[in-house]
Amino acid sequence: MAQGDSWFSTAAAQAHGNLLQELMFKQPAAALNCAGRGESLSHVVDLEAAPEFVRLLGDTSAPAWDGILLSVGGNDVIAAAQTPAHLPDGSEVPLEKRLLRRQTEWGPPSAGVGRYFSEPGWTTLADYLRTNLRHLISLRDQGPSAGKPMFVHCYAVPMPRPAAAEDGRGPWLYPMLKAYAVPSADWLAVSRLMVMHLAQLLKSLAADKEQFPHLHVFDSTSVPLATATPGSSGVSGDWHNEIHLNHSGSFKIARAWSEAIENVLVGPPPKPVKAGKGR
């Protein structure tokens, strides 16, 4: 069974690339995709707001799935990065509730691109993601799929650029980095910093076998992708728009993830036996 954000959605707006559809295994396999064709999940907390998914995950009458595939966390990071420094009434948004710092809050240049980043805001977001993923684990373990592997992927590093989706959404990072006056030369590095923070968090959760049993995280940041050209507004590199992959990008990540999933479900392929020397 699968559930998640736009990287799993089969909506027409995502026809350019769907990570789930690019998965390929040696044995026949099928997944019930709860992300469906309509609005995919915007935030990880919305998973529980999808009653059919919750029923299929944890109800005693649900099937026992071989595994659960999740695409979660990316939109939460994007939303946190989009949080402005001030509300419409002029009041300041505290650092604990946003990921970017105003120019007067920047650290010293010696801090690198980390000087633009709100660590207090990241702590808030990490606690939120940790709590909700732990809740998903508990839902799984209430039903017939208790102890079955739950597979989560990390994301890839997008180039902040003026590339919106066909349905008018976006761009996502580009306007906020401009609003926070982050130098354009540092945009990609700031994007990488946020994606890597999420990847490190997800991997740390998977390493906590007591609180997050049978959680398997695939580090998609290690898959080489063609970065979009700075300033481009359309398809570029392995990207369809600012934050969504095209078919080639989805293909590259999905093929590597397929192997990682298969290694858990059926075990790694046997190592070749070295031929002995003849007498």
Segments predicted by a language model, with ranges:
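The substrate-binding groove and active-site-proximal loops of carbohydrate-active enzymes
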Residues: 116-128, 189, 241-244
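Hydrophobic, aromatic-enriched interface-forming segments
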Residues: 121-174
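Oxyanion-hole/transition-state-stabilizing segment in secreted/luminal serine hydrolases
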Residues: 51-124, 156-166
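Substrate-gating cap/lid alpha-helix
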Residues: 162-217, 250
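Short amphipathic alpha-helices and their capping/turn segments at secondary-structure boundaries
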Residues: 46-68, 132-147, 207
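Histidine-centered active-site loop/cap adjacent to the catalytic His
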Residues: 236-279
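Serine-esterase "nucleophile elbow" of acetyl-processing enzymes
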Residues: 1-38
